[in-house]
Every structure is written in structure tokens, then in C-alpha cells.
Amino acid sequence: GGDYSRIDEKAAAEMFDYAISHGVNYFDTAWGYHDGESENAVGRILSAYPRSSFHLASKFPGYDLSNMGKAEEIFEAQLKKCGVDHFDFYLFHNVCEMNIDAYLNEEKYGTYAYLMKQKAAGRIRHLGFSAHGSYQVVKRFLEKYGKDMEFCQLQINYVDWEFQSANKKVELLREWGIPVWVMEPLRGGKLASLSPDNEAKLRAMRP
């Protein structure tokens, strides 16, 4: 419950500070996270640190088809929200069954061409994609854009290794020579949670 758009920036800033002081230097945000407020908060928090001290990633929100055709408008807004002049890593967000045709329709939307232009200008240092779609969807995306993709972010954990065919997608990406970045290793915490009965038993042993 609660308001997803509300971010406790004081607590978040403390977490960032702890992470940075312990060697973390990669931070990931996106257009839609926290109802559009994540990039604003991340930008404000990271403004306290030298730009060269961290790597920042964001994503083009193609999961919402109403954003197709708005790559320039969205990208410029993202840079402004994050308070930076470039993204170290930028992704086609959530390549899946719902949006693959739009992502591949360069003639109509030109998303890929625009992002490659920003990469050539140094405003995107590394271009990649994240995927929740099927093996066939990832294959179609790679057949069109794979030669220019520098990394892929996949949902990999012991459930999705076979349930979402992560194993086959990893092998496909290996064939393309594209590094794999792991997301959701605990499936949003679900794989770290016990059933209420089992949790109660453990808590009873050590209140």
C-alpha cells in the first residue's frame, strides 16, 4: 500500500552514501519508476557527488506504447531530471511481446536511430536493453539491433532459469558476444520470503 510516487529522500540519501562509501558506483533508474519521481530523486541525491565517481543508467520507456515516437522529448527530460549531461548506460526498457513490433518499427518511430545518434555524440556511453520477453522476442530484437547492443539485463534466478527460459536467452546472448547483467536474482524478494507458517517457526526459535 501507500503512495508509490513518494520517496523518503533522506533515507534514500543515507542509503546512497552508505553504498558509495562501501564501493558501489553503479546506480540504475528509469522513466517510470516511482510514478516518474525516481529520476528526480536520484538526480538530486547524486548531485552531492563528483560525476566521475559513479555510473548512471536509465532507460527508454517503450513498455508504454504511447511513448513511442517521443525518444528525443523523453531523453532530454531524463538528462534534466537526473541533472547530468550523459548517461553511462542507457537501455531499451523491457523488450517483450507487447512492444517488440514497435521497437523494431524504425520507419515509424526511429527510436534506435535517435539513441545511436546520442551515443555518437557521447550522451550515451553504452547502449543496451532489458528483456522480460520470450526467447523468440529477444532473438528478433538481436537480429535487428544486436550488432550495436553492448549489454543485456535479464531476470535471472533459480525459478526463471527455466520458467522464463533465461538459460536459453543467456546462451543466445553468448552467441552474440553480448554481456549479461542480472536483475531480480531474488525475484523482487519473493525468493527470499518464507511462508507465514515457516517464518513464524523461525521467529519462535529466535524472537
Residue ranges and their predicted role:
Residues 19, 27, 42, 56, ...:
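Conserved, mostly hydrophobic/aromatic
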Residues 20-21, 43-53, 76-85, 141-147, ...:
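Acidic (Asp/Glu)-rich catalytic clusters
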Residues 1-54, 114, 120:
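N-terminal binding-site loop/beta-alpha segment at the start of enzyme catalytic domains
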Residues 6-19, 67-82, 133-142:
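Short, acidic/polar
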Residues 94-207:
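Beta/alpha (TIM)-barrel catalytic core signal, keyed to glycine-rich beta->alpha loops juxtaposed to Asp/Glu
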Residues 80-102:
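Active-site groove signature of glycoside hydrolases
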Residues 1-10, 59-69, 101-103, 199-206:
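Active-site mouth loops of central-metabolism enzymes
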Residues 24, 84-87, 124, 149:
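A structural motif
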